[in-house]
Amino acid sequence: MIMESLVLNLQSKNQISDYIAEHHLMHYEAAILNEFIAAIDNNDLAQLQLLNSFGDCFRAITMNLHAYRKGLEFGFTKIAFDQPGWFKRPAFLDTEDLQFGDTSRYGNHSTITLGRGINHTWTYALHYSFGCAGGGYGLSVYGKQFKSRESALTFALNDLKAMMTVKVGSSDTTNDKQPIILATLRDIETAIIGLYQLTLF
């Protein structure tokens, strides 16, 4: 699909307004496009040029600028793009993988990955397995934000625990393997107890 070409200048207001009217936009997309219009109304060519530097079409600019701003919430300030022109995801610091369940076989355990931004804002990724069924997501600037490793881990453990608890006693014996689910829950409880004990010192 050919994306709409965008030439940002002080005469672009109608082009931007038409795009807003013709598309079902995410909240952040509409907000960014309204920034374009505000810059035009203020004759702020420098701001238009800055916005234009994030891509060569409406969609690329809004997505790239949104990604950059989400990264700022973690202290990532570098602006860089890959070859197709999409914003490069930043690398989180102090990442660690914590596994829960039967780690002797692939697919029999779940993994929580912790990481922090430059400003020490933490987040987590989660890959979960019920046996044959599962899912997950990686570390991202779109993830939930926490002020410490401990708070991120506590939230992630409770998140994973809730997922596993729902599957206890499931009649779907093909996808939801009870030994794997119960082993994962045991490891989660051990980790939660360990975190609690750390708060006593």
Predicted regions and their residues:
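Negatively charged, low-complexity tracts enriched in Asp/Glu with abundant Ser/Thr
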Residues: 2-109, 179, 187-201
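Structural boundary micro-motifs
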Residues: 103, 130, 166-170
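Short amphipathic beta-strand and strand-loop transition segments with alternating hydrophobic
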Residues: 109-116
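Short beta-strand motif preference
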Residues: 124-126
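Short arginine-rich
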Residues: 158-174
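Low-complexity, serine/threonine/proline-enriched polar segments
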Residues: 169, 173-186
